[in-house]
């Protein structure tokens, strides 16, 4: 455990940021899974709606620095291709 006050504060901040990042990453994964689930089910309207909801979530994770912009672009492109192929 840290003894210096600034180190204790940094530990608190790191834990807070870790919790926040985990929540955002979970939202990202959940939104991607919703699109894939709708695609597998064959429900085109639900897949399009899920994709429309997932894109801002994916972009938000990029803005927060959780994933690289190329990874986000790859996810959006692949999800869009799967929805269009229905």
Swiss-Prot record:
Keywords noted in UniProt: Ribonucleoprotein, Ribosomal protein, RNA-binding, rRNA-binding
Gene3D superfamilies: Ribosomal protein S20 (1.20.58.110)
Coiled-coil parts of chain: none
One record GO biological process: translation
Keyword rRNA-binding among UniProt keywords: yes
GO CC annotation terms, alphabetical: cytosol; small ribosomal subunit
Gene Ontology terms, MF aspect: small ribosomal subunit rRNA binding; structural constituent of ribosome
Signal peptide (residue range): none
Matching SUPFAM superfamilies: Ribosomal protein S20 (SSF46992)
NCBIfam families for the chain: S20
Function recorded in the entry: Binds directly to 16S ribosomal RNA.
Homology family: Belongs to the bacterial ribosomal protein bS20 family.
Identification of the protein by name: Small ribosomal subunit protein bS20
Source organism phylogeny: Bacteria, Pseudomonadati, Pseudomonadota, Gammaproteobacteria, Chromatiales
Name of the coding gene: rpsT
């Amino acid at each position: 455990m840290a003894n210096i006050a600034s180190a204790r504060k940094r530990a608190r901040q790191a834990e807070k940021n870790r919790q926040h990042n985990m929540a955002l990453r979970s939202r990202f994964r959940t939104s991607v899974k919703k699109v894939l689930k709708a695609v597998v089910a064959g429900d085109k309207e639900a897949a399009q709606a899920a994709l429309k909801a997932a894109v801002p979530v994916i972009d938000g994770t990029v803005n927060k620095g959780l994933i690289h912009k190329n990874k986000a672009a790859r996810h959006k492109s692949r999800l869009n291709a799967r929805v269009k192929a229905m």
